[in-house]
């Protein structure tokens, strides 16, 4: 699977000046850029595109690098694939006796971007220009695209014992006896399509969610 960024006809590259960051943010920026480059998520860029960067707070108090892709998103042809309905999901859980919850490791980052579209993801910082080689948070079509891929992968089990909400997977058989078997089927599907769960964030054999 590859992520594609289709633009409106006649779109010209947009390049913004780097946003001003506080000294402590600059230090965190260098740290996160080094880490993401080491992991192969980003690379140096000479693209004519360039969006600004800022930081958002995570629930655990840490800061996450966030690319302000609004100029790119404005020119992107929108993917209309529907996102999961959380209320519908909870309705489906009625009668389930046991649950397991799988959290994909850096979910969006597990999907590569089509090579010719990588330059469109470029962002500018005081440390230089970079571009993503994998799907990034902030891209307007990332949620619907990821949802479509997950639904394609798990379609045989959806509405039976498995539901996916973006990068979270819930396994919920109606009886405990089938749970281990169903969990193995879901894990086998992840392995088949080379998606990986983050074990430390997964929870197994829960009695409520």
Where are each of the predicted segments found?
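Retroelement reverse transcriptase polymerase core
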Residues: 1-209
């Amino acid at each position: 699977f590859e992520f594609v960024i289709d633009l409106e006809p006649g779109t010209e590259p947009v390049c913004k000046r780097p946003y001003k960051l506080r000294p402590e943010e600059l230090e965190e920026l260098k740290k996160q850029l080094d880490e993401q480059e080491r992991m192969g998520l980003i690379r140096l860029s000479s693209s004519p595109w360039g969006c600004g960067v800022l930081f958002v707070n995570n629930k655990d108090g840490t800061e996450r690098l966030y690319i302000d892709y609004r100029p790119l998103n404005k020119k992107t042809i929108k993917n209309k694939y529907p996102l999961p309905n959380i209320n519908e999901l909870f309705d489906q859980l009625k009668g389930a006796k046991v649950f397991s919850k799988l959290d994909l490791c850096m979910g969006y980052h597990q999907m590569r971007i089509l090579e010719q579209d990588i330059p469109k993801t470029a962002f500018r910082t005081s440390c230089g220009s970079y571009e993503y080689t994998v799907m990034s948070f902030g891209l307007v079509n990332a949620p619907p695209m990821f949802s479509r891929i997950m639904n394609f992968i798990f379609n045989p089990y959806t509405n039976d014992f498995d539901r996916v909400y973006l990068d979270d997977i819930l396994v919920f058989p109606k009886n405990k006896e089938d749970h281990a078997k169903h969990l193995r089927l879901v894990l086998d599907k992840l392995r088949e399509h080379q998606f990986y769960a983050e074990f430390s964030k997964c929870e197994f054999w829960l009695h409520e969610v």
